[in-house]
Amino acid sequence: MISFQRTENLSASALMTYENMRSYYEHYAVDWDCSKIEEQIRDLVNFDLLLKGEVVGAIRLAFDNDSCYVRDLQVSHHHQNKGFGAAALAECERLAINSGTNRLKLRVFRISPAYKLYVRSGFVVDSEDERFYNMSKMLS
């Protein structure tokens, strides 16, 4: 059973992000390491994705007046392509609606396979550049 809880160990969560994103950082020559990631996520709303009590992913959110920004969605390598990303997005939607926002926004590397998940989940591309798709989904 999948569940969510506030992140207790930001260092471990940052390490998962670094391990998942390292190939993208290398591809785009982004100079990030675990300490930089931890610094960036410290002020976000951080949740762990749990499977039978084991942390298998993370979501990081930021809110403004009308939008919830999915700043990061990670699923550990061994648990990818098993529905955990879709479950995490559903939790993001629930949290966004409960906060009173009417839109989810995110940015994804153009070369990321997660792009397909976001399209399947109802996100549309609002803009793009050489590295990223900026996407959003209106909430009801």
Over which residues does each language-model region extend?
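A short beta-loop-alpha structural element at the N-terminal edge
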Residues: 1-15
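Conserved GNAT-fold acetyl-CoA-binding loop/helix
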Residues: 14-44
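Conserved acetyl-CoA-binding loop-helix of GNAT-fold acetyltransferases
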Residues: 75, 81-94, 119-120
